[in-house]
From Swiss-Prot:
Region (Disordered): 103-413, 476-610, 668-700, 712-734, 753-814, 1071-1097, 1109-1128
Protein name per its UniProtKB record: Enamelin
Phosphoserine PTM sites in chain numbering: 196, 219
Top-level lineage group: Eukaryota
Organism field: Mus musculus (Mouse)
Residue ranges with Low complexity bias: 128-142, 273-287, 318-330
Sugar-modified residues: 130, 252, 259, 269, 300, 1066
Amino acid sequence: MLLLQCRNPTSPPKPCGLVPNVKMSLLVFLGLLGVSAAMPFQMPMPRMPGFSSKSEEMMRYNQFNFMNAPPMMPMGPYGNGMPMPPHMPPQYPPYQMPMWPPPVPNGWQQPPMPNFPSKTDQTQETAKPNQTNPQEPQPQKQPLKEPPNEAARAKDDAQPPQPFPPFGNGLYPYPQPPWPIPQRGPPTAFGRPKFSNEEGNPYYAFFGYHGFGGRPYYSEEMFEDYEKPKEKDPPKPEDPPPDDPPPEASTNSTVPDANATQSIPEGGNDTSPIGNTGPGPNAGNNPTVQNGVFPPPKVNVSGQGVPKSQIPWRPSQPNIYENYPYPNYPSERQWQTTGTQGPRQNGPGYRNPQVERGPQWNSFAWEGKQATRPGNPTYGKPPSPTSGVNYAGNPVHFGRNLPGPNKPFVGANPASNKPFVGANPASNKPFVGANPASNKPFVGANPASNKPFVGANPASNKPYVGANPASNKPFIGANPAANKPSIGTNPAANKPSIGTNPAANKPFVRNNVGANKPFVGTNPSSNQPFLRSNQASNKPFMRSNQASNKPFVGTNVASVGPKQVTVSHNMKTQNPKEKSLGQKERTVTPTKDASNPWRSAKQYGINNPNYNLPRSEGSMVGPNFNSFDQQENSYFSKGASKRVPSPNIQIQSQNLPKGIALEPRRTPFQSETKKPELKHGTHQPAYPKKIPSPTRKHFPAERNTWNRQKILPPLKEDYGRQDENLRHPSYGSRGNIFYHEYTNPYHNEKSQYIKSNPWDKSSPSTMMRPENPQYTMTSLDQKETEQYNEEDPIDPNEDESFPGQSRWGDEEMNFKGNPTVRQYEGEHYASTLAKEYLPYSLSNPPKPSEDFPYSEFYPWNPQETFPIYNPGPTIAPPVDPRSYYVNNAIGQEESTLFPSWTSWDHRNQAERQKESEPYFNRNVWDQSINLHKSNIPNHPYSTTSPARFPKDPTWFEGENLNYDLQITSLSPPEREQLAFPDFLPQSYPTGQNEAHLFHQSQRGSCCIGGSTGHKDNVLALQDYTSSYGLPPRKNQETSPVHTESSYIKYARPNVSPASILPSQRNISENKLTAESPNPSPFGDGVPTVRKNTPYSGKNQLETGIVAFSEASSSQPKNTPCLKSDLGGDRRDVLKQFFEGSQLSERTAGLTPEQLVIGIPDKGSGPDSIQSEVQGKEGEMQQQRPPTIMKLPCFGSNSKFHSSTTGPPINNRRPTLLNGALSTPTESPNTLVGLATREQLKSINVDKLNADEHTTLESFQGTSPQDQGCLLLQA
């Protein structure tokens, strides 16, 4: 330190005065060189552990150190003296070459001695040779404007490094003999070597990265990074991490060849190996690192060598940034080329950080994260664009000084950057001219220095590759250390982009579990959302979200959300689930402002089912991201609502900007601002009130159709009950998160799964709205119905439709219009809603007619379902969602609505994300079919099993169970509304239906024998009870629904997709899949349902089969039914699945209804009821009339009966077998559904006529089990 002090305070002669100049030079050089060589090695070693990048960079820069860069670095330091560059390069290479190369110093000891005085001269001369000095000093000055802070910081950093090691900046050790003054100058030299960095891309021994702030700068920068992360500069140092490449870029900038070569190699290196690998993640990582661990990126950036140098370069980088944002094709290419990661880079890495993460991290994330991200990609420049100025310091890690004179160093970077490029031609030409000596470091040094930056990219660029392993690895390697913040943070930061998405992106990881999974998942997912969304919406998040995403975090989240919904929607980003989640979470806050806070909370909870974070309604705004919700909520209509409650359509309005689909959708019923989400409520008869909107983002029209009716009235009037139900719907939405996937297929199917369109067509509108109309008949939704008057055509149609099928046909039209809208879903959902609603009336009225017999039967379904609805608001909807979403059922039932939403939805969201993607496709089909058919015969839901789904009656048939579970989960009251009103007008008094039937329905009568979770799906439960819970014999009859052998394979795929979708699909699907002869019936079921759906168009009974299959197969309730009604293995299996967590809870939560409905029947329902049904078949038929009126069980049993009944099944079996690519087993189920439909027709008529015996007789073939189901109902 004495030497340093002597040298530092005094010009080199003074150290020479202390010691003979030669001795001093030798001692200082040898000591400093040895220490610097040793110390940088030592320091790199510590930094290596701490900052892989830095240590590696240091090591690499140690390579630099002995490379020409050190001589250049002295040149830079002497250049700090400023006169040095031209003269110094020759002298430096001789003098400093000895200095830098450990071997040389002995030979060069004397030359250094002369050079010491000469170095003072050289410093002057160097400043002179840096004829760019006018430029360089200006760049320095300009940088010094900002660098004063940076330089001061660099000084502080450099000076502390001076004390830290005598050569505080790894650079100093080398140049310190020349830098006695420059050392204090060096921070200033950093200010000035900034252009020395420009020139010397030693950037104070940029090559040695002693100039990087010196390695000691690394050492300190390690601290500095840690400190600066606290400062706001960490993002700026994040920029320097991008500037790690920027040094190369700086070199690149300085040396045009180096710039092109280095930048390209660096970019290429970074882009392909690291840009993609490190930067790709680091694009995400760095942002996150910047976000969370900006210090390490900062360190990386600083480690990159010249935080202070970065100052000038940041100005330079701003140009790069301007070029880079997208212009930087290396960066852009990486970002975009690494579409997947690139989206991370592109959206997450670059755009996401800016847009997606930027919004979250915004200032620092944008600043540092972008910088880091681009810097990570080795495009210090692309990051610079991301960073803005972040990469202004790209060559020089001036990303730190990114905000300040950096821009001057964009202006001055034309000057300074031109010193970096121009002065680098001048200065860099010294480092190109002198880089024969100096520029050989930049070319030699690019072989040396640029090789540091290329060699050093092996060294420095390897820091950018190595250091990207080191520096980029800082962004991965030093990100183990610094970039571990950038990778720790990249685990933190990239993981923030995944990890810090755990951290920052954990907001985006909560989201990015959904969102970070989007950002990782979503960068796979969010990044894919932001890939997907960034492809579309994340690009909006990049572009629009530069505008919109910047705001996006706030409200553009809503805007972004819808847009992403549209994007994700069209992209059918199942990954966007995660992505979308991230977005969802982002959107959460906007969604949060949805009119229904509880629903918003639910939505948010729903949308962030995986992330409990969204629970905070603000958080769930992210889910409002339709890119996420579009996935999740799109997949799950309820999730959509959860993401953006229908009430939150205002948020959807916010989302609407992004969710273009939402905008049109919600436009049709903008009065129901929240309604757009209903669009997803294809299967949201119950939930659409609250959840459909978010989920229906893709189907705003459907959702709007639904939500207008359902959501507003429930939200407004049934707020307590309906809202509670909607909470269930919201959680049903989350439960519908599987539905979400289900709905997402709507979203996607809008684009991808058009088959789901039938479902969506019917489901969103018919399902939700007809149910709402029916439910409107119910006390709950009567209010809603009044408020539904926006959609009153459907409401009245439903209520009126129930009496008149043309009304149902209208609703069917509406519902199919919804599907049409669903086609529009992305865009014109609302408009097509009513419009297409009528067109579908034309096509579907026949189905309603076909369903008309079931219309009479349908009242039972509504009745049965309605009882589900009635209790459902509080318990039944939880039960239904729970039953439907077995995982969710418990929470819903236990926690009236919200707990279930949270419980099952979180779990189910993951499950639905897992399973829903495959299943929502099928479910979309099923829902399309079921809802479509059901919607067609809104009260002939019985006629078309699918119709059961669309409407509560259909829901009640067991499809209704599933969909109603979804709906019930989302809008249990709505479902009550729909089902009950429809049912009430015909079969039961509202009060009776509501109270009595609800419980009966909730019991799922026979079906809920296993589990009461199917309150709404009583039909489905009964269906499934016959199928699932009923003994194998009952399963024979129930086979259409859940006959393990036949219907499970057939209907069950339908069931699971449509009914079991969210939770039960996971549970029932898993169980039934495990237990079912056709474990992959869902896989088959989707094709079957889809096939059947086409056949549904062709053959309503086939559709009914599909629908019934789905009704059976839609086993949210069926799952409990499976559980309990399967009396044996299935119930046990499902019970194992459900009971531990949800069945018991569900039973507890649904005790009033579930116990009343099916829990008592669980044990006895399958066996006892079967025995009773067999023993008391006639007796039960007579007893059954009240129960028989619970045709849902008949629907199921009818299916089962059809399944058992050979002739009807056989008659239709070939059709369905042919029509539905179902296994013969599935075929019987389908046939059962057909037979059931026919039977249900007659039974329904009889039932409407109160001819229960006739109904029983119709089911008499199935009586033992049908009656068992009926008995359970009774």
